[in-house]
């Protein structure tokens, strides 16, 4: 079976690192638990220029490599790969962050996972034709049985996958969001995500045996 996994704030603790950068750059002290919006410009009350500076700093290779792993992520993902499932990392990171992103995965024992970069949020200014880039249209043509996302802005994308259960990793910026439908389920940690996946896998197997 095929599994889609978002990168930031699902596999690694991106927002927590950005709160640190905002403090260092602008002396803006917003605790992680108070990051109420996926849009960090809004969460940190930044000007356009400040936001650009924040995003640039957050995607410097040495900073990307410093992001902490979300507890339990690599262990659970590797268990799924060992069970024979196809697992893909699908990220909305800037296309030019491929090398450090690939290295981060490799250093956290996720070297077996392919990673695809998709312009999920309309941030890319130029079309880039690399083997690791996908257009939204190409993404929508793919099939996934299970997806893990945290960003409300990305929910519309995973809705294109037919019969796909979506685990929403519980984060401050999605706590007040109304989910699109019953296929979206809030999970507090990777253990809950695994339980949801096992239920989905069992359902899929039972459905195929009918």
Per-range role (PLM):
Residues 24, 82-83, 107, 160:
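Secondary-structure boundary motif
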Residues 43-60, 114:
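Short, basic/glycine-rich phosphate-binding loops at helix/coil junctions
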Residues 97-210:
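C-terminal cap/substrate-recognition subdomain and adjoining C-terminal extension
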Residues 61-89, 93-101:
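Short, acidic loop-to-helix structural element flanking the phosphoryl-transfer center
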Residues 28-32, 87, 112, 146:
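Residue-level detector of short coil/turn "hinge" positions at structural boundaries
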